[in-house]
Amino acid sequence: MAGKQAVSASGKWLDGIRKWYYNAAGFNKLGLMRDDTIYEDEDVKEAIRRLPENLYNDRMFRIKRALDLSLKHQILPKEQWTKYEEENFYLEPYLKEVIRERKEREEWAKK
């Protein structure tokens, strides 16, 4: 029982650190999501290309709005900030698929 409490306490502590970092990074104040800020290497570019049109358009809207706010040295009103609890990693499944396919191609190339 004591072990479960220790795991629960460390999980809450780690979640608190994640929330703090999410807010400290500042991208949420511009309305961006975490996946909007990922460095675009070849795998990420391919994953973005595979996004459904509505997700791609939402991403482009957030990025363009963030650029506009940044140029004006402004941030969104607090009620429009992206919240940690509402974050969805929309690019992750597509990125995992692209990486899996690339690794599979590399394995085939070795044979």
Swiss-Prot record:
InterPro entries: QCR7, QCR7_sf. The keyword Protease does not apply. GO terms for cellular component: mitochondrial inner membrane; respiratory chain complex III. The keyword Acetylation applies. The modification N6-succinyllysine is found at K12, K78. Gene3D superfamilies: Cytochrome b-c1 complex subunit 7. It is a peripheral membrane protein. Its main location: mitochondrion. The modification N6-acetyllysine is found at K12, K19, K78, K83, K96. The modification N-acetylalanine is found at A2. It holds the Pfam family UCR_14kD. Keywords: Acetylation, Electron transport, Membrane, Mitochondrion, Mitochondrion inner membrane, Respiratory chain, Transport. One of its GO terms (biological process) is mitochondrial electron transport, ubiquinol to cytochrome c. It is found in: Mitochondrion inner membrane. SUPFAM superfamilies: 14 kDa protein of cytochrome bc1 complex (Ubiquinol-cytochrome c reductase). Component of the ubiquinol-cytochrome c oxidoreductase, a multisubunit transmembrane complex that is part of the mitochondrial electron transport chain which drives oxidative phosphorylation. Belongs to the UQCRB/QCR7 family. Component of the ubiquinol-cytochrome c oxidoreductase (cytochrome b-c1 complex, complex III, CIII), a multisubunit enzyme composed of 11 subunits. The complex is composed of 3 respiratory subunits cytochrome b, cytochrome c1 and Rieske protein UQCRFS1, 2 core protein subunits UQCRC1/QCR1 and UQCRC2/QCR2, and 6 low-molecular weight protein subunits UQCRH/QCR6, UQCRB/QCR7, UQCRQ/QCR8, UQCR10/QCR9, UQCR11/QCR10 and subunit 9, the cleavage product of Rieske protein UQCRFS1. This is Cytochrome b-c1 complex subunit 7. It comes from Pongo abelii.
